[in-house]
Amino acid sequence: RLIFVCGKEWVDNEETIRNYTIRTLRKCRIANHYGTQNEAVLCIIAEKLYVQDLSEDIFSFEKMLAEISDRIIIVAESPGTFCELGAFVMDEDCRRKTMVINEDNADYENSFITKGPIKKLESLNESSIIRHNGLERIKNSHEYNFKVQEIAKAPLTIAINDNAGSVELKSLIYELANIVELFQPVEYFEIETLYKRLKDFEGY
């Protein structure tokens, strides 16, 4: 499944809760129908996908990533993630699949973030909030580990694209991933050709 993980700006090998969460998710594996195991999660990291000269603004780009994701995890650890939290909580579809990891700090009890988007999310689903007292506590938190595993291994239903005129991006990603899994190593041209033949699409 696709998990959009938001948090402090991504820096390789930096010890942040976001990086730790991504590493934890990547360790989750599930058995497939071919007698082997696959990674259960593909973590979406916006900074690794957004191209600076892309005509689309980064807010709209992240909104698209949120829409195609099965779950959204927001680690509230930077001003940018506070903006993402507010935007995603105000969107009904994003809100229902969002989990927030937030610092349990008395100084923030009356902040806008706590009284606004976090309170709204908590009123709809109390289990969608994980409070912490730092990375080391997160590493030893039974609640954190349980909820992350639950997200990684939740049942998944994917709609099938059967109309070349209205291909859904999320379904397309999963369908192409299945082709790669079955036929790898495979090149882009081969993937596209296989997809169109399997679907009986002239184009999409």
Language-model features, listed with the residues they occupy:
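Conserved BB-loop
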Residues: 30-59
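Short amphipathic alpha-helical interface segments
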Residues: 165-203
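Short, aromatic/basic amphipathic alpha-helical patches
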Residues: 15-29, 110-123
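Basic/polar, acidic-poor N-terminal "presequence/leader" segments
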Residues: 1-23, 183-186
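Cross-kingdom TIR/SEFIR domain
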Residues: 84-131
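Short acidic, S/G/P-rich loop/turn micro-motifs used as interaction or catalytic elements
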Residues: 9-16, 48-52, 74, 78-81, ...
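Long, low-complexity, charged/polar intrinsically disordered regions in eukaryotic proteins
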Residues: 116-168
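Donor nucleotide-activated moiety binding/catalytic core segment of transferases
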Residues: 55-72
